[in-house]
Each structure stands twice: as C-alpha cells, then as structure tokens.
Amino acid sequence: MLRNKYNYFIYRLANFLYPIEVQKTAYQIQKIGNDYSFCMVPEKSLSEASIVYSFGAGEDIHSDIGLVRSYGCDVAIFDPTPRAVKHFEELRDLTLQGKQYHCESGLTYEVSEAEIKKIRYEELALWKEDSNLKF
C-alpha cells in the first residue's frame, strides 16, 4: 500500500530503474483515504479477519480509518513521533466521548466509536538497528 504521494514517487522511480512485471488481476484498485493520506488496495483483498500494519501515521490517519470502514479489518498503526501520538490520542479520546475531532491542520474526522476501537496504536518504528531514537 502506498501511503502518500512521496511513497508513490519512490515506487515509480524504483519501477523505472528496476522494472517489474505485474500480473493483472480481476480486481480493481481502490483508493482509500484523502489526497494526502491514502492507500491503494485491490478490491476484495481484505476482510474482517485481516490485520493491516501501517507505519508512519503522522497527523493524518484517514486512510487507516477508511480501511476499517471499508473492510471492517483491524489496523495496527506504528509511529513513535510525539505529534503523531498526540494526534491519535486526541482523536481517540474525543471519539470515545462522542465528539468530532478537528485537528490543527483543519482536517475533520467522522469516525465512530466502533471504528476507532478497531485501530491499535503502537509507539514503535522500523529502523536499521535495535536502538532508541529521540524525536
């Protein structure tokens, strides 16, 4: 899944340098999320039994919420950065209080209590070595 335009650019560049042959499937590709935080998923590839691992949430998890909403799957988000942690905690807390979340960037979330409960947040990151990083 490609989380944003930067990842899409890297994917296109890598494919240009090292072309790969992609097999066609009977499934259509579905864009989930918004123009900044999105992922591309083959339709019918996920189910309620699926778990999606999402790395680098930042301050926009519309794609993660969209996956839960579209497929009913569980999503595990991994991002240890303080702003991302604060963003998720505020969204979760307000959602569980029955309130709508409006973040600093102007984005609004419409997420249900059941949807937010299907998202697990971990303050962990992928790194090239086993160490503690400061943000």
What do the predicted segments below correspond to?
Residues M1-F135:
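Phosphate/nucleotide-binding beta-alpha loop and adjacent structural elements of enzyme active sites
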